[in-house]
From Swiss-Prot:
Complex formation: Acetyl-CoA carboxylase is a heterohexamer composed of biotin carboxyl carrier protein (AccB), biotin carboxylase (AccC) and two subunits each of ACCase subunit alpha (AccA) and ACCase subunit beta (AccD).
Gene: accD
Gene Ontology BP, a term: fatty acid biosynthetic process
Name of protein: Acetyl-coenzyme A carboxylase carboxyl transferase subunit beta
Cofactor detail note: Binds 1 zinc ion per subunit.
Organism of this sequence: Pseudomonas savastanoi pv. phaseolicola (strain 1448A / Race 6)
Length: 306
């Protein structure tokens, strides 16, 4: 028995440990929809869209702006703004501590990034929510960064695009966060008065005070495939109305069928299609889009588990 342990079992365990340690962390990713094991470099080439089932995975705000805007000429707006715990709010944890943890986790100061730049050579300003930062919740800094982006559009006579991904208003800022709904809506009214386009792109998920304000105020409202969009969550609605909701309720396809949004665009098509749309809205020549050359990647065998 002892010889079997020494000769067979222990070497087997050691080989298993070596195999596990030889796989770099983050090299493989499991699709949350079809559970396919995907090679991270290959997934980056598809803009974090599963090549097996077309599931659009959540991506960070900075990554989203980097793949949407042209490489040259980007400038971040409102980067100097930092959140302040004016109310000294505390639930199960101090708001100040929640901010510190979110900043450490994401590397961002708050849940919205705004940048000026170009889209296919056309001047634009774009904002994107960082859902990993406290659920992309909207507080004072999110509202102010959004307003600064809109003011940039007003000053430079350029269109604005916003990628929404949020659970709603930030409860730790109470009325201050609710005020951002009116603040962002007011500046969008100014854009409309000046005839400057605002395109809202709804990504997974968009809920609460963000869906009840800026996210649904676009001149054109676009959504990514199968994004969850609503005000209250489906479970809350079912408990309130005491009825089973339809299949796919609050998915972008359901909203498109019922006239709540204008179109659904896959992530890889956002640059050319929004570029063409904005050029028409601004009465500019149709921009030329050159699709990037995607070089083939040698995908190693996937591990049994990740």
């Amino acid at each position: 028995m002892s010889n079997w342990l020494v000769d067979k079992l222990i070497p087997s365990i050691m080989r298993s440990e070596v195999k596990k340690s030889s796989v770099p962390e983050g090299l493989w990713h499991k699709c949350p929809s079809c559970e396919a094991v995907l090679y991270r470099p290959e997934l980056e080439k598809t803009l974090d869209v599963c090549p097996k089932c077309n599931h659009h995975m959540r991506i960070g705000a900075r990554a989203r702006l980097n793949i949407f805007l042209d490489v040259e000429g980007r400038e971040e707006l409102g980067a100097d703004l930092e959140p302040v715990d004016r109310l000294k709010f505390r639930d199960g944890k101090k708001y100040k501590d929640r901010l510190t943890a979110a900043q450490k986790q994401t590397g961002e100061m708050d849940a919205l990034i705004s940048m000026s730049g170009t889209l296919l050579g056309m001047p634009v300003v774009a904002s994107a929510f960082e859902f990993s930062f406290m659920g992309g919740s909207m507080g004072a800094i999110v509202g102010e960064r959004f307003v600064r982006a809109a003011n940039y559009a007003l000053e430079n006579r350029c269109p604005m695009i916003c990628f929404a991904a949020s659970g709603g208003a930030r409860m730790q800022e109470a009325l201050i966060s609710l005020m951002q709904m009116a603040k962002t809506s007011a500046v969008l009214a100014r854009l409309r008065e000046e005839g400057l386009p605002f395109i809202s792109v709804l990504t997974d998920p968009v809920y609460g005070g963000v869906s009840a304000s800026l996210a649904m105020l676009g001149d054109v409202i676009v959504a990514e495939p199968k994004a969850l969009i609503g005000f209250a969550g489906p479970r809350v609605i079912e408990q309130t109305v005491r009825e089973k909701l339809p299949e796919g309720f609050q998915r972008s396809e359901f909203l498109l069928d019922h006239g709540a949004i204008d179109m659904i665009i896959s992530r890889s098509e956002l640059r050319p299609r929004l570029g063409n749309l904005l050029a028409q809205m601004m009465n500019l020549p149709t921009p030329r889009f050159v699709a990037p050359v995607i070089e083939p990647i040698v995908v190693p065998p996937a591990p049994a588990t990740i």
